[in-house]
Every structure is written in C-alpha cells, then in structure tokens.
C-alpha cells in the first residue's frame, strides 16, 4: 500500500477555484483501479494552538493506492491531465509526498 500526502498551493485567492476543479474529478479518481482513498482537505478552522496550519491558499489531498503502478496510472489518467490543464495558471506549487508504512 502506498500513501500520498499532496500539498497544493494556489495563487492568492484562487484556492476555491482550484478546489472546485479538484472536486469535479474526484469521482473519476475514486473509480480508478487501485484507489483506496482520495480526500481533499483544508485546515480545521478552530482547532487551537497545537495546529500547524496549511494556510488560506493551500489544500491537501490524502490518498491511498494499492501499489506504485496504480499511482503512476493515476498521474496519467485523462481526468488528471484535464485537471492540470484547467488549473495550471492557478497553482503556485504542488508537493507530492509518496509514503509507505514505517
């Protein structure tokens, strides 16, 4: 099993627009072979001082994939290519952390 923690930083004020595009492809992603979890997340509003916030222009994606081949196929899926095309001018950076259980 492979886990992904992806951190996406949108241009100032554009996070909601990027999230809308991400939400639109989420059903197709969840239907992909090997996808166990695909969850878009943002900061909990009022957790308190222990929280390290991502920030107002940032969201993350928590993903679980059966194996590396499934994750690679996800990256090349037509809906992901379309997502990248739609958001290329709205995103400042993406940090994709590919993780395995310790």
Question: Could you say what each language-model-derived stretch is?
Answer:
Residues 39-57, 82-102:
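Glycine-rich beta-strand-turn "strand-cap" elements at beta-sheet edges
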Residues 9-10, 32, 80, 91-93:
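Hydrophobic/basic alpha-helical segments enriched in Actinobacteria
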Residues 1-2, 102:
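Absolute protein N-terminus
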Residues 2-9, 39-75:
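Short, well-ordered beta-strand segments in beta-rich or mixed alpha/beta enzyme
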Residues 14-40, 78-84:
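Short amphipathic alpha-helical segments
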